[in-house]
């Protein structure tokens, strides 16, 4: 006993559930890499042999491979659901966040069953928007279940939020659009015009600086 106080910091545990690694790579990598500096982050995803797709994700992030199918498959979906419930019970996450319809449905049910305190889903589009008849009604019902079982709902645009409200899927008081709307924001450094290149092109084309193009 050295007499020194030993402090063990237990980070809050967060799980992010997506159907494919492409979603995490393209839309969520920046958020995940930021979150992992403050929280214990786990990605639950169907890798399907594409582990390299997550090479832009911090190695501090835990990755669990789960066979979630994008399309409806009763037996595969039930298996994924029970596996999710088991994972949630075992890890005792404080928050789970799902993106994409299938991941959203299975995660919301599993997290509700496992009594995860905070359950968040992000709507990025509706597979039923162009459907008609019973198929449209059924798929819309699944989105309503997602809304009912989650404690928080994010929508990636105001137009989509208005559409979902109009269709009776959710209400404005239980859904949030961050900022001006976007699933992952815009990298302003990447899309910032280059003044050097601008001046070079204007010089090559003999265009004066005060000319509006």
What is the meaning of each model-derived region?
Residues 4-12, 56, 192-213:
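Nucleotide-sugar donor-binding and catalytic loop/hinge architecture
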Residues 13-18, 111-127, 143, 154, ...:
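Active-site proximal beta-strand in glycosyltransferases
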Residues 64-65, 144-198, 207:
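Donor nucleotide-sugar binding/catalytic pocket of nucleotide-sugar-dependent glycosyltransferases
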Residues 26-27, 75-82, 117-118, 127-149:
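Nucleotide-sugar donor phosphate/pyrophosphate-binding loop at the beta->alpha transition
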Residues 87-94, 207-208:
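Glycine-rich phosphate-binding loop signature in dinucleotide/nucleotide-binding domains
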Residues 16-76, 163, 168, 174-176:
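N-terminal strand-loop element at the rim of the active site
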Residues 98-104:
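Short His-centered aromatic/hydrophobic patch
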Residues 45, 98, 154-158:
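Short beta-strand scaffold positions
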């Amino acid at each position: 006993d050295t007499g020194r106080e030993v402090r063990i910091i237990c980070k809050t545990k967060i799980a992010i559930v997506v159907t494919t690694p492409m979603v995490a790579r393209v839309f969520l990598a920046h958020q995940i890499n930021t979150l992992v500096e403050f929280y214990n982050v786990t990605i639950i995803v169907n890798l399907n042999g594409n582990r390299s797709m997550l090479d832009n994700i911090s190695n501090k992030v835990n990755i669990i491979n789960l066979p979630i199918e994008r399309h409806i498959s009763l037996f595969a979906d039930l298996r994924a659901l029970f596996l999710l419930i088991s994972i949630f019970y075992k890890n005792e996450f404080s928050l789970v966040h799902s993106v994409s319809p299938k991941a959203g449905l299975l995660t919301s049910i599993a997290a509700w069953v496992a009594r995860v305190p905070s359950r968040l889903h992000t709507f990025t589009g509706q597979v039923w928007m162009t459907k008609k008849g019973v198929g449209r009604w059924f798929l819309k019902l699944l989105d309503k279940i997602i809304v009912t079982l989650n404690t928080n709902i994010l929508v990636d645009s105001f137009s989509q939020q208005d559409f979902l409200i109009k269709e009776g899927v959710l209400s404005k008081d239980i859904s949030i659009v961050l900022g001006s709307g976007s699933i992952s924001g815009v990298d302003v450094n990447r899309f910032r015009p280059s003044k050097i290149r601008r001046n070079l092109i204007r010089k090559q084309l003999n265009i004066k600086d005060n000319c509006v193009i």
